[in-house]
Amino acid sequence: VESNHLGGICLNWGCIPTKALLKNADVFDIINNANKFGIEVGEVTINWSKIIKRSRDVAKRLSKGIEFLMKKNKIDYIPAQGRLIGKGNVETTDSNGKKALASANNIIIATGARPKWFSGIKPDGKQVITYKEAMILDKQPKSLVIIGAGAIGVEFAHFFQTFGTEVTLIEALPNILPIEDNDISVELEKIFKKRKMNILTNTKVTKIEKLKTKIKVHFQGDEIVEAEKVLIALGV
């Protein structure tokens, strides 16, 4: 039973499509540094819509592959929402509101994850976004504040900054990638700073102020950072 696309968050909106975006960034970086290898190239331009489309196509293709494997292995796939209604029983509701009953001796709940945000600071999908909107932006932002420097935050920081977005990365704990080994965190911070990324650690956001064409991010000490968009990447 699955109400969205087969493969869940990781395949459709997480690990897989973000790695496709990072591959685009790596190729762009290699081309821009080709002269170091004795290869001369002309002016390099990007097609943002194609960059985004490639990532989405990768996710769609793999999700379709899972659907094929379900059929091949004779696994019943019910595209619907499921709700436990008693021992061994799941009520399903499809997109048209049609209900049905599925029964089994054993039931596994594997419902995935959802974005986390501050109390009182909720994403609007336009100026204040989550990882999902960040993967399908129709236009590259000129500037971006990323709140949270875990795996999700640093991946998007690398991706957007490589393509020229001015990135500010904010983390409440002493290091970026706070749950990784300290030597990894320190080394990555050096790399990001060498690339002129603005990194603020030990920094807690107190307020997000939305204006017409920009956002002001307030943090302790009455400090403010302005950007076109804010990406909330808390938790992971």
Stretches found by the model and what they are:
Residues D138-E180:
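Rossmann-like NAD(P)H-binding beta-loop-alpha module
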Residues V1-S3, I147-G148:
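The Walker A (P-loop) glycine that initiates the GxxxxGKT/S ATP-binding motif of P-loop NTPases
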Residues E2-Q140, T168, L173-L177, D183-V186, ...:
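Glycine-rich flavin
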Residues T111-G112, T203, L234-G235:
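Conserved NAD(P)H cofactor-binding loop of Rossmann-fold oxidoreductase domains
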Residues I107, E228-I232:
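AMP-binding/adenylate-forming core of the ANL superfamily
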Residues Q81-R83, G150, T203-K204:
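Conserved acidic residues
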Residues N198-L200:
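Conserved SAM-binding strand-loop segment of SAM-dependent methyltransferases
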